[in-house]
Amino acid sequence: MKHLLIVSLVFVTIIWKIECETDMYDDSSIVKTEETEEVKPCGLNEVWMVCSSCEEECGKTPQPCPRICQPARCQCPAHKGYRRDGQGNCIFCHDSVPKL
């Protein structure tokens, strides 16, 4: 039973990552918030996500992330090799940590 749960979790994570990589990322760097209608740029290497999700950190094993649309925000695009560093910056990581 434990193995079935692990296999199911890995399968769902892989499907989620494939779908995110193919249709969720928008590489625009200027954002317009609905509340204020003011234009704000994303930080270096970040992209604006209308439907954001969990982010990965350099040097840490990726954790399962529920497929729930979180509030719009600038996000670090993991599908391009970018992760958050210890200071919260979006940087390209040369990790040897395996992806789930």
Curated annotation (Swiss-Prot):
Disulfide bonds join C42-C74, C51-C69, C54-C65, C58-C93, C76-C90. SUPFAM superfamilies: Serine protease inhibitors. Residues 42-93 form the TIL domain. GO terms for molecular function: serine-type endopeptidase inhibitor activity. The keyword rRNA-binding does not apply. InterPro entries: Ser_inhib-like_sf. Keywords: Disulfide bond, Protease inhibitor, Secreted, Serine protease inhibitor, Signal. One of its GO terms (cellular component) is extracellular region. It is found in: Secreted. Residues 1-20 form the signal peptide. This is Serine protease inhibitor 1 protein. The gene is spi-1.
